[in-house]
């Protein structure tokens, strides 16, 4: 019940009320806003000069030397040493030659905050040992796997799988013992470099170049491992739906809103495979704009059903943190649970389905309901 209005008995008070005027409106704002300074000075990594790559790399094998620079700088230098020509590509992409120092150095009246020279006066020009080269391989292997899958956190979670890939590569290079002993950089994690590279506008072009270049040995063996990881990386929705359509044995497939999106999914994926051919499995890794056509929002009901099924059937998906029911979906989890109780037939006669649903089910080998 609204509060009663208080009666004003005082004549002066009544007069004051009659004379009340609302405050004047605020003056119009000019529309200006705080601006970033031109050529912002946020600390950034660098790659040094091309002629110094090897000497910089030798110096940065030492942890005390690495600690002097931006945490991403050593990883970029190791990559430039690993792949000749990458330095020029990085420069073209806007990567600075100068790296910020972790702590500014004062020399007389001058304070140095960044430099393109990463080696010291005592750093000798020498060839790398085989174990040093393998250690750089190991670091860059983890780094590039993190780049193609788009996440440093997945590198931390899948450390054992990455070690297995590195051991496989070392065995292919006839240096199986290095799979265990190439540990000179094991305390230098590539996680910050992964996140930095993944934040660059050229990351997709970088990955595409790696995947489409014919490298000589040992680059071929190295990239073979990267390609295995890059295949269908960042395409979880696509791979989950494909597995669902091929292996699901319950009637969630026949829910009308799910079934109609199956037809759409098959059409879109077939068109993308035709357009991109051998590059189709790498659309996610190279950040191709067409990858969004296979995102959950394109097939929200089908994706919801696929994630629901996969979380029930696939132990590796049990910890998948994304919501089961995708934005834009009309199917409900209770509906999926109800349809899951009934099985479908594949290759054998079963209870007949309605005409349009039946035609869609035949596309994925479903012949009826049990």
UniProtKB/Swiss-Prot annotation:
Cellular location(s): Virion; Host nucleus
Predominant localisation class: virion
Effect of residue 362 to K: In strain: Halle B1/91
Keyword Flavoprotein: no
Keyword Disulfide bond carried by entry: no
BP terms from Gene Ontology: symbiont entry into host cell; symbiont-mediated arrest of host cell cycle during G2/M transition; viral penetration into host nucleus
GO cellular component terms, semicolon-separated: helical viral capsid; host cell; host cell nucleus; viral nucleocapsid
Keywords assigned by UniProt, alphabetized: Capsid protein, Helical capsid protein, Host G2/M cell cycle arrest by virus, Host nucleus, Host-virus interaction, Modulation of host cell cycle by virus, Viral nucleoprotein, Viral penetration into host nucleus, Virion, Virus entry into host cell
Motif Nuclear export signal mapped to chain: 128-141
Motif segment (Nuclear localization signal): 3-11
Pfam families attached to this UniProt entry: BDV_P40
Acidic residues composition-biased segments: 10-19
Region (Disordered): 1-25
Additional record remark: Isoform P38 does not have the nuclear localization signal, nonetheless it is localized in the nucleus.
Biological role: Encapsidates the genome, protecting it from nucleases. The encapsidated genomic RNA is termed the NC and serves as template for transcription and replication. Targets viral NC to the nucleus. Could be involved in the transport of nucleoprotein particles from the nucleus to the cytoplasm. The nuclear export signal is masked by the interaction with the P protein.
Oligomeric and partner information: Homomultimerizes to form the nucleocapsid. Binds to viral genomic RNA. Interacts with P protein.
Name assigned to this protein: Nucleoprotein
Species of the source: Borna disease virus 1
Organism taxonomic ancestry: Viruses, Riboviria, Orthornavirae, Negarnaviricota, Haploviricotina
Gene from which this protein is expressed: N
């Amino acid at each position: 019940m609204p509060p009663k209005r208080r009666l004003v008995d005082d004549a002066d008070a009544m007069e004051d009320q009659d004379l009340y005027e609302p405050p004047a409106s605020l003056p119009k704002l000019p529309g200006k806003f705080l601006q970033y300074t031109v050529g912002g000075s946020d600390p950034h990594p660098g790659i040094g000069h091309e002629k110094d790559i090897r000497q910089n790399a030798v110096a940065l094998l030492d942890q005390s030397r690495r600690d002097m620079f931006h945490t991403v700088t050593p990883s970029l230098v190791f990559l430039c040493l690993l792949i000749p020509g990458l330095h020029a590509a990085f420069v073209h992409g806007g990567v600075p030659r100068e790296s910020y120092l972790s702590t500014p150095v004062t020399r007389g009246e001058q304070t140095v905050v960044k430099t393109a020279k990463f080696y010291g006066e005592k750093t000798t020009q020498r060839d790398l040992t085989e174990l040093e080269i393998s250690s750089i391989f190991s670091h860059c292997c983890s780094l590039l796997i993190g780049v193609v899958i788009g996440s440093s956190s997945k590198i931390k979670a899948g450390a054992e799988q990455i070690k297995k890939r590195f051991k496989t590569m070392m065995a292919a290079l006839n240096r199986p013992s290095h799979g265990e002993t190439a540990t000179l950089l094991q305390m230098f994690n590539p996680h910050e470099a992964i996140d930095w590279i993944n934040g660059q506008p050229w990351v997709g072009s970088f990955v595409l170049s790696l995947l489409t270049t014919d490298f000589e040995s040992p680059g071929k063996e190295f990239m073979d491992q990267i390609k295995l990881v890059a295949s269908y990386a960042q395409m979880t929705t696509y791979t989950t739906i494909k597995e669902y359509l091929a292996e699901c044995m319950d009637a969630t497939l026949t829910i009308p809103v799910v079934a109609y999106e199956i037809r759409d999914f098959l059409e879109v994926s077939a068109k993308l495979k035709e357009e991109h051919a051998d590059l189709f499995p790498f659309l996610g890794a190279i950040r191709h704009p067409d990858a969004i056509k296979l995102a959950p929002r394109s097939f929200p009901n089908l994706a919801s059903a696929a994630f629901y099924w996969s979380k029930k059937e696939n132990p590796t998906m049990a910890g998948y943190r994304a919501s089961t029911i995708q934005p834009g979906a009309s199917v409900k989890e209770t509906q999926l649970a109800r349809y899951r109780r009934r099985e479908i037939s594949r290759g054998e006669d079963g209870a007949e389905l309605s005409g349009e649903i039946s035609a869609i089910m035949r596309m994925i080998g479903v012949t009826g309901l049990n």
